[in-house]
């Protein structure tokens, strides 16, 4: 039995890929955990997103873990993450894209319509699993050019290489979000608000305008 609510409504799926490597220790991991908490709280307070937004959280340090398997926002329980290890970001991207494809198949199996899924990536550094870079980058390019996902990469703090992140965006020319390590929690508020906007939109629309970014987040083009 698939973990899907509100079969008659159009759904939006979102995978959060979050960095829990050693450099995220201290304030950054606390900010991340608080961000994941307010993200769920905001979705659950919206009567539409409550049953139509589906969420998955994948963490990556030395290992990649699916800490929250896909579930309706109504059932989302924020994880409490700890920092340590390297930065297996490329493996996380591949895992996230696999999770999206599996969720889309579940939607199709039960006849649920869906908006283009979202992949949100947050990191404070650069990947250490470079042997998987080509695979991860190509998978993203195929998905983006095939209009199969929306991708939101975000670098936090001075150690994040936004130019490296840019290579993962559509044709290497998409936007990268940027914020300080001490103040990126609002990205999760923006993400949940934008998902709520999409979930409330006319299902026949092909494009929806998202919420404006908060002042604490900049865009690098």
List the predicted regions and their residue ranges.
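Acidic, polar low-complexity linker/tail segments
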Residues: 1-15, 20-30, 44, 104-114
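DG-centered beta-turn motif at the end of beta-strands
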Residues: 18-21, 32, 57, 96, ...
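Short, charged loop segments at secondary-structure junctions
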Residues: 24, 63-95, 126, 143, ...
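An active-site-proximal "capping" alpha-helix that borders the catalytic cofactor pocket
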Residues: 32-45
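Short beta-strand-loop
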Residues: 51-80, 162-170
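Von Willebrand factor
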Residues: 76-115, 150-163, 182-190
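Von Willebrand factor A/integrin I-like adhesion domains
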Residues: 153, 157-214, 221
């Amino acid at each position: 039995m698939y973990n899907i609510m509100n079969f008659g409504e159009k759904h939006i799926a979102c995978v959060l890929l979050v960095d829990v490597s050693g450099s995220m220790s201290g304030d950054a991991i606390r900010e991340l955990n608080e961000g994941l908490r307010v993200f769920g709280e905001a979705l659950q307070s919206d009567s539409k997103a409550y049953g139509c937004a589906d969420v998955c959280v994948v963490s990556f340090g030395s290992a990649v873990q699916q800490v929250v398997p896909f579930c309706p926002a109504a059932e989302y329980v924020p994880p409490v993450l700890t920092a340590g290890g390297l930065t297996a970001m490329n493996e996380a991207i591949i895992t996230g894209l696999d999770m999206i494809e599996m969720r889309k198949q579940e939607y199709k199996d039960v006849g649920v319509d869906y908006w283009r899924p979202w992949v949100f990536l947050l990191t404070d550094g650069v990947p250490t699993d470079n042997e998987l870079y080509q695979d991860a980058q190509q998978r993203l390019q195929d998905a983006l050019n095939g209009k199969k996902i929306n991708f939101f990469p975000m670098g936090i703090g001075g150690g994040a290489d936004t130019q490296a992140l840019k290579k993962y965006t559509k044709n290497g020319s998409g936007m990268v979000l940027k914020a300080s390590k001490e103040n990126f929690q609002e990205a999760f508020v923006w993400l949940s608000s934008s998902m709520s906007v999409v979930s409330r939109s006319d299902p026949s629309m092909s494009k929806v305008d998202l919420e404006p970014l908060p002042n604490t987040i900049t865009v690098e083009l």
